[in-house]
Regions:
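Histidine-acidic metal/acid-base catalytic patches
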Residues: 7-37, 41, 45-47, 64, ...
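Active-site mouth loops of central-metabolism enzymes
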Residues: 41-57, 79, 120-136
């Protein structure tokens, strides 16, 4: 049996554990963001990397390489103004890139924070003209999603205010409800509207969608195809994110995740670099809900800004970490855990739970990759391929001069 201690994992033979693990890994896919390959940074600036992608084609090429190495990233999240600056006119080019590189367009992310008109908000702006502009961009994003066959429209807004008394919070709620209802009316039957929340930044007095309760309300108001999007970095320190996940699962409002890690706020560090146990706990709640007939149709997405780590290396590392933590959580003996919880055997329950987390699942993930014709160690394979060095040579003159965010 793999490491982790006696009684910490489901009581199966090694062959049965491998069979179970392979099934769990077969079910796991995670979307990677186009902007994660570009020269993104912080509000204080950024450090350019020669191998960073500077065009939508280079982003697709990088995404395809990550999928070739890991086998679990078949879709690329797109940011409308960064990746499709001409809107629907850019769709044919994106479709051609899908065919060329073998990865598909994933979630469509509207950009409601970049234009100068959004200084005082987008869908919540006191100006009806600006609100109409923002709503028009939402509807354009939905049409782009339809044209690309993308299911999810992932909405994050920077709307809020910095000083007490400067905005009517309730008026802004009403404007937002109206815009989301209208957006929902334009969804195709197979599309979803995912409403993301964030407690602060760039607004520091109030943020219009600040927590999961507000997102839940807005999703219900918008319509039956709306769900909540949880960004793991968009919470106050020490907040119990897995409890939020459990509530959203219970109320059938969990639509997906933007995965990243943080030490203080929305740091956009690589997943599991600071608190891997938290991600394990989140995945456990999802596995437990799935056992109860809930938890299906959850979109797993990465949302990170690789300002110091190499873009490709960080993305591959994140995908591998996500697989490992997902599998660790799958290996919890939930039947035995339920028995221990019912009897309030606190130490035994916690030790069983922690034992799965401490289990070294790398032999299982490596065996799964080999069984699927993938490199056993994707990071080593990336390094040995010379891909990053080739990209640096080909892109360096452009990437080191780029000034836009993504």
């Amino acid at each position: 049996m793999l490491g982790g201690g006696k009684g910490t994992m489901m009581k199966l033979s090694n062959s049965k554990i491998q069979e179970f693990a392979f099934k769990a890994l077969d079910d796991f896919q995670i979307e990677i963001p186009s902007w994660g390959f570009a020269n993104t940074g912080t509000r204080f600036g950024k450090f350019a990397q020669a191998a960073a992608a500077t065009t939508i084609e280079e982003k697709f090429a990088d995404a395809a390489e990550v999928n070739r190495l890991t086998g679990v990233t078949p879709t690329v999240a797109l940011h409308v103004l960064w990746d499709l600056p001409n809107g629907l006119k850019d769709v044919p080019e994106v479709k051609a890139l899908e065919r060329r590189y073998g990865v598909r367009s994933g979630s469509i992310n509207p950009n409601l924070f970049q234009d100068q008109e959004y200084k005082y908000g987008s869908l919540c702006n006191p100006s009806a003209t600006v609100r109409a502009q923002a709503l028009g961009h939402m509807l354009d994003s939905i049409e782009i999603g339809k044209a690309l066959g993308s299911r999810d429209i992932s909405l994050w807004m920077a709307d809020g205010s910095n000083y007490p008394g400067t905005q009517s919070i309730r008026n802004r709620i009403g404007w937002l409800e109206e815009s989301l209802r209208t957006s929902h009316e334009h969804l195709a039957p197979n599309q979803r509207l995912l409403v993301e929340y964030k407690p602060f930044e760039p607004a520091f007095y109030h943020t219009d969608i600040a927590d999961w309760g507000m997102s839940s309300h807005l999703a219900r108001i918008a319509g039956p195809q709306a769900r909540v999007l949880v960004d793991t970095g968009h919470h106050y320190n020490a907040q119990n994110i897995e409890q939020i996940v459990a509530w959203l699962l219970h109320t059938n409002l969990l639509g997906g995740f933007h995965f990243n890690d943080r030490r203080y706020a929305d740091d956009d560090l690589t997943l599991g670099s600071i608190d891997p146990y938290q991600i394990f706990r989140i995945f456990h709640e999802i596995h437990a809900a799935t056992d109860d007939g809930l938890g299906s149709d959850i979109a797993y997405m990465i949302d990170q800004s690789h300002n110091l780590k190499g873009k490709m290396e960080a993305m591959v590392q994140t995908v591998v970490t996500a697989q490992e933590l997902y599998l660790k959580a799958a290996l919890v003996d939930r039947e035995e855990l339920a028995r221990l919880q019912q009897s309030c055997d606190l130490v035994a329950a916690e030790e069983l739970y922690r034992g799965a987390f401490w289990t070294d699942v790398r032999p299982l993930t490596q065996a799964w990759r080999e069984a699927h014709g993938l490199p056993a160690d994707p990071l080593t394979a990336l390094k040995e391929s010379g891909y990053v060095e080739r990209a640096a040579r080909e892109r360096g003159s452009r990437s080191m001069a780029v000034s836009s965010y993504a």
